[in-house]
A protein has these predicted regions:
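Beta/alpha (TIM)-barrel catalytic core signal, keyed to glycine-rich beta->alpha loops juxtaposed to Asp/Glu
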Residues: 2-220
Length: 220
């Protein structure tokens, strides 16, 4: 089997941001991400951009990319928080001088599940240190060598995000212990195994099962 089969999936071009068929199944196109990245490399030569990077790349996909391109990505933007530490990916990227940008550093509530920032242990650590729970998680992310990307539109929260500081070793270790490989952002409804975790056949099945909900949720 070709390990790169079904590797290059993207939404088909069209007027809709989220193209689904009559059954609610996402319509994917075969787009070569290596070719796309090479085009981004050419942009560097124009001076119009200063750096290029990738998002949601596994170690396997990074290795495939690096073998065929010249410029090492400046960043790999992935979901990361104490519930999803991805230590192997972090170590690999650090060894290649690729920064990890952590999105959803507090977890999110898109699925209605409790967020990482709401974990009782996070609040215990925050109370003991006299810190906001969100700032605690931001501090944890910076301390482990990642670029943390918290989202906020509130001026006070934006200012608070700048109050990160080094955590005591025991507090840092406590937060590390929360690891459970929990993803809040898992696009299984797309029908593509983007994270190399469930297999393409399972991902396609999950995409079909999500079809009825997709038809009502993704209308633009």
């Amino acid at each position: 089997m070709n390990p790169e089969a079904n590797e290059n999936s993207a939404f088909v071009a069209g007027p809709k941001w989220f193209p689904v068929d009559n059954d609610g199944i996402f319509q994917l196109a075969d787009i070569d991400y290596v070719a796309t990245y090479k085009a981004m490399e050419e942009l560097l030569q124009t001076g119009k951009v200063r750096a290029i990077g990738v998002s949601n790349f596994s170690i396997r996909r990074l290795e495939h990319l690096l073998k065929q391109t010249e410029v090492v990505p400046a960043v790999n933007q992935v979901e990361a928080h104490p519930y999803l530490t991805q230590p192997d990916l972090l170590q690999y990227c650090q060894g290649k001088d690729i920064f990890i940008q952590a999105y959803s550093p507090l977890g999110n509530n898109q699925t209605g599940e409790p967020r990482t920032v709401d974990d009782p242990l996070v609040h215990q650590v925050a109370q003991r240190l006299g810190m906001d729970p969100g700032v605690v998680l931001g501090s944890w992310g910076v301390q482990r060598g990642t670029i943390v990307l918290p989202k906020s539109v509130t001026p006070s929260r934006i200012a608070g995000n700048l109050q990160v500081r080094e955590l005591p070793e025991d507090a840092f270790a406590q937060l590390n212990s929360l690891e459970r490989h929990k993803r809040y952002n898992f696009p299984s409804r797309w029908g593509h195994d983007i994270f190399d975790e469930v297999g393409e056949e399972t991902a396609k099945k999950m995409g079909k099962e999500a079809g009825p909900e997709n038809k009502t949720k993704f209308t633009v």
